[in-house]
Amino acid sequence: AVINTFDGVADYLIRYKRLPDNYITKSQASALGWVASKGNLAEVAPGKSIGGDVFSNREGRLPSASGRTWREADINYVSGFRNADRLVYSSDWLIYKTTDHYATFARIR
């Protein structure tokens, strides 16, 4: 089953400490032939979503702590170009969502 909703992915992360199996990193997707500018992820990796890459938090909109790293995952992806919905999660399991491509965040776990 594809798990790609905010609550579904957040619950999975808390329970299993990793993303669901339908997530692949940008480099894994690229190796399969994904080209972001073509919006072809669903063609080259059916049922997959992009997730697991580092989120740098350059703007400092998420809380920082010594040793904390952030990763991101696409949410609600079906096909075509990626949307603005992302789940961002920390190495100590803080989980935030953004529906406007990182402009604002709301903590959900």
From Swiss-Prot:
SUPFAM superfamilies in the cross-refs: Microbial ribonucleases
What are the annotated GO cellular component locations?
extracellular region
Which EC numbers characterise this protein's activity in its record? 3.1.27.-
What is this enzyme's class at the first EC digit? Answer: hydrolase
This protein's UniProt keywords: Endonuclease, Hydrolase, Nuclease, Secreted
- Where, by residue number, is the active site? E72 (proton acceptor), H101 (proton donor)
The record's subcellular locations are: Secreted
Molecular-function annotations in GO: RNA binding; RNA endonuclease activity
A Pfam family hit: Ribonuclease
Job description of the protein? Hydrolyzes phosphodiester bonds in RNA, poly- and oligoribonucleotides resulting in 3'-nucleoside monophosphates via 2',3'-cyclophosphate intermediates.
Which family is this protein grouped under?
Belongs to the ribonuclease N1/T1 family.
Under which name does UniProt file this protein?
A: Ribonuclease
Q: Which organism is it from?
A: Heyndrickxia coagulans (Weizmannia coagulans)
